[in-house]
């Protein structure tokens, strides 16, 4: 039995553990491979290298899940949108400004995403049978905000202003991304992923009305469409920074697993775990400290969530400067936890 799926099967005796960005720049073996390829998107499409870095943290830490090495921006890139990654800057994109910009988006991915699906198939063959494989995509609002801003996370004035002033056009772009995201997720499961995750990293910048329109409704549509085809596939949703709107999200979106950030009180996580499986929510910065602090902060979470429907994770991704021994210590502490 795959340990990560234990809460779904009503078995919460052992707490599953994996970490966002567990394959990444904090690992020396990752850095060694990253040095061999200049362009980040080429890296994401390289079947052998992306497979290897997906498996690296599993070999090192034996996490209960592997998450495929990819990026939320491979989808717009595969659809013809101009996306590039600049060193020490991050993603730079063609900026979506008007109806005319739809001409730069294609109706299909022209097989560009086939390499992602090949990576999943290859990882699946090499992954231990007890380890879950997570496929993922960026939620439509987050991908859309990158397209509207033309770059990585800013103050979101540009994207929010666009939405306020161009509601119909915004909905048209949103619906386009809903369809393509659904297609991408289904293909990942058909290639071998057995859990899916939707990352909505930018959801916390929206007021309630826009949060409902651009986060809740799109996520709900995607999940319902995926479940029509793949009713048994668990789906994780991560509306990062949603704050009080997490409550509304849980009530209205038919998710299996809710990932939460470190700002959410533990008692809320405990309360929500009666309705959904909760995943989170250690502050990634804690892993930059020492073993005593890591143990203290992990204990605070574990003693509240032990026996609940819970997956241990971080409130966001592992930071590049994280010491590898701290990740090992935390993982072993979670596995051996007893009150």
From Swiss-Prot:
Enzyme Commission no: 4.1.1.37
Catalyses which reaction(s): uroporphyrinogen III + 4 H(+) = coproporphyrinogen III + 4 CO2
A GO cellular-component term linked to this record: cytosol
GO MF annotation terms: uroporphyrinogen decarboxylase activity
Gene3D superfamilies xref list: 3.20.20.210
Feature type site, description Transition state stabilizer: 71
Name this protein carries in UniProt: Uroporphyrinogen decarboxylase
């Amino acid at each position: 039995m795959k340990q990560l799926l234990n809460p779904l099967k009503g078995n919460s005796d052992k707490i599953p553990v994996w970490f966002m960005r567990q394959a990444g720049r904090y690992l020396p073996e990752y850095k060694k491979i990253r040095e061999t390829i200049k362009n980040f998107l080429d890296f994401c499409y390289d079947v052998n290298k992306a497979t290897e870095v997906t498996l690296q943290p599993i070999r090192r830490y034996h996490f209960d899940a592997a998450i495929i090495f990819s990026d939320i921006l491979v989808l717009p890139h595969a659809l013809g949108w101009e996306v590039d990654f600049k060193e020490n800057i991050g993603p730079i994109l063609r900026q979506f400004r008007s109806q005319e910009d739809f001409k730069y988006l294609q109706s299909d991915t022209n097989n560009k995403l086939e390499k992602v699906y090949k990576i999943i198939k290859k990882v699946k063959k090499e992954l231990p049978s007890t380890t879950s494989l997570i496929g993922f995509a960026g939620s439509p609002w987050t991908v859309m905000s990158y397209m509207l801003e033309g770059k990585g996370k800013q103050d979101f004035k540009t994207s929010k202003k666009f939405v306020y002033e161009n509601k119909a056009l915004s909905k048209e772009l949103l619906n386009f991304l809903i369809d393509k995201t659904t297609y991408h997720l289904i293909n990942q499961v058909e290639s071998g992923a057995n859990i899916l995750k939707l990352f909505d990293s930018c959801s916390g910048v929206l007021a309630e009305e826009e949060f409902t329109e651009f986060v809740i409704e799109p996520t709900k549509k995607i999940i319902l469409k995926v479940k029509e085809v793949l009713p048994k596939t668990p789906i994780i949703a991560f509306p990062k920074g949603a704050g009080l709107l997490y409550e509304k999200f849980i009530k209205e979106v038919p998710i299996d697993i809710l990932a939460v950030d470190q700002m959410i009180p533990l008692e809320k996580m405990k309360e929500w775990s009666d309705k959904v499986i909760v995943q989170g929510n250690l502050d990634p910065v804690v892993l930059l400290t020492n073993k005593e602090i890591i143990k203290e902060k992990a204990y605070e979470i574990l003693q509240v969530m032990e026996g609940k429907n819970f997956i241990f994770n971080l409130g966001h991704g592992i930071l590049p400067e994280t010491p590898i021994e701290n990740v090992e210590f935390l993982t072993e502490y979670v596995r051996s936890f007893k009150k």
